[in-house]
From Swiss-Prot:
Belongs to the alpha-ketoglutarate dehydrogenase family. The lineage of its organism: Bacteria, Bacillati, Bacillota, Bacilli, Bacillales. InterPro entries: 2oxoglutarate_DH_E1, 2oxoglutarate_DH_E1_bac, DH_E1, KGD_C_sf, ODO-1/KGD_C, THDP-binding, Transketolase-like_Pyr-bd. Homodimer. Part of the 2-oxoglutarate dehydrogenase (OGDH) complex composed of E1 (2-oxoglutarate dehydrogenase), E2 (dihydrolipoamide succinyltransferase) and E3 (dihydrolipoamide dehydrogenase); the complex contains multiple copies of the three enzymatic components (E1, E2 and E3). E1 component of the 2-oxoglutarate dehydrogenase (OGDH) complex which catalyzes the decarboxylation of 2-oxoglutarate, the first step in the conversion of 2-oxoglutarate to succinyl-CoA and CO(2). The keyword Nucleotide-binding does not apply. It comes from Bacillus mycoides (strain KBAB4) (Bacillus weihenstephanensis). The keyword Oxidoreductase applies. GO terms for biological process: glycolytic process; tricarboxylic acid cycle. It is an enzyme of class 1 (oxidoreductase). Gene3D superfamilies: 3.40.50.12470, 3.40.50.970, Multifunctional 2-oxoglutarate metabolism enzyme, C-terminal domain. This is 2-oxoglutarate dehydrogenase E1 component.
Amino acid sequence: MTRKNTTTNPWAKFHGPNLGYVIEQYDLYVTGAGSVDPELQELFEIFGAPSFQDDVVTGDNTATHFSPQNTGNIEKILKVVQLVEQIRSFGHTLAHINPMEDAANGQSLIEKTMNELSDADLKAIPAKTVWQDAPEGIHTALDVIHRLKDVYTKSLAYEFSHIQDSEERAWLHQMVESNSLRQPLSNKKRTALLKRLTAVEGFEQFLHKTFVGQKRFSIEGVDMLVPVLDEIVSEGAKGGVEDVMIGMAHRGRLSVLAHVLEKPYSHMFAEFKHAKIEGAVANAGWTGDVKYHLGREQVVGNEEVSTRVTLANNPSHLEFVNPVVEGFARAAQENRKKSGLPEQDTTKSFVILVHGDAAFPGQGVVSETLNLSRLNAYQTGGTIHVIANNAVGFTTDSYDSRSTKYSSDLAKGFDIPIVHVNADDPEACLAAANLAIQYRTLFKKDFLIDLIGYRRYGHNEMDDPAVTQPQVYKKIKNHPTVRAIYADQLQSAGVLNADEVETITQFMQEELKAEYAQVPPADTSAATIHVKVPEVVAKGIQPIDTGVSIESLRAINEGLLSWPEGFNVYPKVKKILERRKDALEENGKIEWALAESLAFASILQEGTPIRLTGQDSQRGTFAHRHIVLHDTDTNETYSPLHRLPNINASFSVHNSPLSEAAVVGYEYGYNVFAPETLVMWEAQYGDFSNTAQALFDQYVSAGRAKWGQKSGLVLLLPHGYEGQGPEHSSARPERFLQLAAENNWTVANLTSAAQYFHILRRQASILGTEAVRPLVLMTPKSLLRHPLTLSTASQLSEGRFQPALEQENLGAKPNKVKRLVLSTGKMAIDLAAEIESGKHEYSLDEVHMVRVEQLYPFPAEKVQSIIKRFKNLEEIIWVQEEPRNMGAWHYMAPILFELAGDKVKTGYIGRPDRSSPSGGDPFAHKAEQELIVAHALDVKYNFRQDKQEIEVFSN
C-alpha cells in the first residue's frame, strides 16, 4: 500500500490546523472511510504516515520521535491543535482583566478541551507540531499550552480572530506570543512609572481634600490611563509624529491636562479657586465653559524628541468629539499648497480617542466615526482607541447599558484588534500601549485598548455610588490603589525599599502644596452678569468687494469646460456643460452650479484651498454640479478644477458616507485645524441635517463663545417647499435662527446665482481672520435652474453680496405703497414669479417687496432705509412657505415690531402652526402656495384685529 521513501520528510512543513487536516486525511487513507485529497494520497503512498521530529531532545520535557502510527491516537493530536486555537481565540474568557473580579472560571470551551487531555498526552507531542514558531525553551505541547495560557489568560487578553487580513493576524499573534512585547522594564523605568502613578493619585487626592464637593470627575480606578497616554505619545514622538490629537470626555480629563499636557498644577488650582494667576493662558471664549470641558495644546518631550499634543475642547455630549478630532488629524496630515488633491502624509499626526465603557457601545456617533476609518476622504492612517472602562455609566451597570459581553465589541465589526488589560497591572498596560502604536505605525489602521478598572467615587464627587452599587463599592472601598499595588511589587522585587517609596510620595505632596501656595485668593471682581463679545465679532462682517473681472471669469469658464483628449464625458452631462459655454457672453445667463464653479475657481486662484463633502456632492443631489466627470468607457474621473492655471491651492470634493453627525463633526474639526481652508458640508437634503444637531448646538454655533474655537465651516442645506413631503422640504431654518446670537454665524437663504457667488467669495475672504464665522446656507432645489435666479456676467464681476434685495418693478410710486412684503429664498421667488407673470388681476401699486437674503445678522439698516421711503406705509408682513411655528417667523417677529414702530402694523402670512413641516399631497401643496402668494400681494386681504396675521388657512 505504501512506497516508503526515507530520503526526505515532507511533513515538516505542516503545523497547527494544517497538520490536523493532514492527520485526518491519513486516517481516512488508512481506514478507507472516505475520499482523500489526491495529492496527499500520493504523499502517503510514497512517504507513509506523517511523522515529526522535535529539534531538541533533552530530558523529560522533550517529546521523542512521534507519529500517529507510534501513538495510535490521532484524536489527541487534533485536540491539541484545537486547544491551541481555542486559547488564541478565547483565552480572553479566562483572563484576569477585571481588578474587581477574580480570574474567570467555569466550564469554558478551553477547559473542556483541557479535561480531555492529560499532561502525559501533551508531553508526548513535540512543540513544533502545534506551534511552528515556538520560542526557545518550548519543547512539548505541554510547554506550548502553559506558554499560551500565560500569554492569553492573564492580565492581558487579546481578541484577534476577527481580523480578516491573515498577515495582520499573524503579526499580532507573533508579537504577543514572542518575548518582544513583554520585555522586562528597567529599574529606572519602573521607578519612573511609580512616580507617575504617585503624581496622578496625589493630584486627585489633593483636589479631593482641598476642594471638597467640587466636580472633577476623578480618574481614580483607571489611573493607568495617564501612563498609557504618555507611552503612546512618547513612542509617536520617537517615530517623528508632529501632532498627536486627543479626544476624551470629562472623566479623568483634569489629570490628563495636568500630566500629559503639562498644565501647571497652580493653574489647575486657580480654576478651582476662581483666582487669577500670572502666566495662565485662557483658552476659553467670552462665555467660557467648565474646567473639565476645556482643551489645551502643548509641545511635550525634550530638545531631541518632541511633539505637539492637542486635547480637543469637549462638551458633555459623549463621543461627539470623536469625528472632530479625526478632522484635526486629517488637516494636520495634508499639504494644501498645490493644485489638485491635497497630499496626505499619515505619519505627521495621529489620533487617540478615549472612550467611556457605556458611551462606546451606546452612542451612534461612535460607529459613524469608526466607519470613516477606511474611507479615502476621511482615513487618518489609524486611530488608537482607549476605553477607560470603569464598568458603570453614572448609576447604570454594564448589563443594562449594552447587549454585548465587552464594551469594545462594536470595534470587531470594523476589523479592529482589541486588547483587554487589567488597569491594576501597570506593566501590562504599557505593553498594550506599545502594541497599539506599533500596529498603527505598521498597518495604518485603528487599534483598541480596553483599559478595565473601576470608579473609586461616584459619577461626580457629590454623588454616593453605594446607593445603587452597594456591593461593588464595599469592594472598592477596601481595594488598594494601583500605585499602592505597584509600590508593593517594586519592593518585593527589590527595586525600591519602603523608605524610597515614602520619599516619592512625600515629594509629590510637597510639590502640590508649593503649587497651591502660588495661587492668590479668589477674584470675586471677575464675576459679572455682563458677557462682553469681542468687538471684532460684535461688529460683524464688513462689506467686502468680491467681484471678479469678466475676462478672468471667461478664462476660468473655458478651463472648466475642458477635459483631456480621449476622455469620454457622459453625453447627457456633456450637453449640460456645453450649455454653459456662452453663459458669460453679453446675453448669457449663469445658473447656480456654474456660479459655484466660478466662485470655487476664483477662490483657488487667490490661494485658498477648498474641501467639499456630502453624500452626493461630486455630481450634486439634483444632478446640477458635475464637478467630477466620469469617463464612460474607463470610469476614470477628472475634475477641471484640478487643472486650471495659476492655482497654488488644493481642491477636494468627496462623496461622503450616509452619515450626518460624524461627517459634520469631521469637517468642523478639519476647518478648525486648517482655518485657511474653505471647508463645506452639503446635506443631501436639508431635512436630514438634524441628525447632526448635537454638532450644530455644541460646536458650530457655540464653539467660539465657549472655547474661543474659531470656524468658517459652510453648511449647504437644500431647502424649499415643492410638494415633496415632510422629508424633502425643510432644512429647519428655525433651529439655526434660534441658535443665532452674538454674531456667531451667518444664516442666509439666497435668490440668485450671483448672490451665491459673492457670499462664497466673502466667506473665503474672512478665513483665518478674527472676523471668521460659520456660514449656514439654505440652498435651492427647483431654483437651481429657475429663470428668475439666473445671473449675468456683470452681476458676478461687479459689487458684492447684498444682505437684502428690493424686488424689481415694484415700489415705483412710493406714496401709494401701503404694504411692505419681506420674504426669503424660494418663497421670495414664488412671489417674484407672480409679479413678473402679469397674470394677477389686482394692482401692485400699493405693494413693495424685499428679499431678505441674509437672515442673520438681519440687515436692519438696509431695510430701515427702505421703510423710510414709504411715508404712507401701513403694514409690514413676513411671508413664508413654512408653517407658522417653523421657518423664520418667530425670529423675524420682534425684528419687524422694532422696525415698524407704533404706527405701522406687522404680521405674518403663511401656513398655520403644524406638527409636521410639510404635507404629503403635491396638489394640496400647490393650492396652499397659490393662496399664500395671493394673500401676500393683494392688499384687499387685511389683518384680523385680534391677530397679527392674515388667516390664510383655518385649522
